[in-house]
Amino acid sequence: YQDAFAEDLNFRFTQRFTYDLGEGGYGSSRFVLDKALRERELVRAYTRFLYGEKTEGTEWSSSLSYARGWKGDSGRVGATWLYLGADGQTEPYDLVKNYKVGARFRRQAYRDWLFWEIEPSYNWRVDEPYLDREGAWRIELRLEFLLFDNPGETLEKQIR
């Protein structure tokens, strides 16, 4: 489900049910609220819930991010995200497993259909309640191939 509350405010809800032979059945719910600030900038609130046969109760994550799209001197597009978030579970203990703050940098690479991303973040994790949180750096590298493109979409929609 998707709706525009206003010209610059968009809401999306996605519900998915899946059955995997190894993992069993599970469902996920996603809520996304985007507020456009300018043509190439937005603030996003994102929440996801996951419940399944092999999850620890309801597993959840939530984040607030600022995204800005840009175009380099070479004509290649990119985007930068700054975010903070948390994730946790409801069973066997109701706890926040991780707090995080990070950035994600995305850039069009060698071809128009090839993108790379680098995402450094700092995380404060705990595995069991009442233990001390441990801080840890995390760096994710991604390479993405864009198979289908809608040239009519704005850059704002493409950075989502």
Language model features by range: what are they?
Residues 98, 117-119, 132-136, 157-158:
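Composition- and surface-driven signal marking solvent-exposed, interaction-prone regions
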Residues 3-13, 27, 39-47, 58-60, ...:
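Outer-envelope beta-barrel architecture signal
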Residues 134-160:
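Outer-membrane beta-barrel "beta-signal"
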Residues 23-29, 56-62, 95-101, 133-139:
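Residues that define the transmembrane beta-barrel architecture of outer-membrane proteins
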Residues 99-128:
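C-terminal structured domain segments
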Residues 1, 30-34, 63-69, 100-106, ...:
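Outer-membrane beta-barrel architecture
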Residues 75-109:
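Glycine/small-residue-rich hydrophobic helix-like segments
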Residues 3, 15-23, 35, 47-53, ...:
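Transmembrane beta-strands of outer-membrane beta-barrel pores
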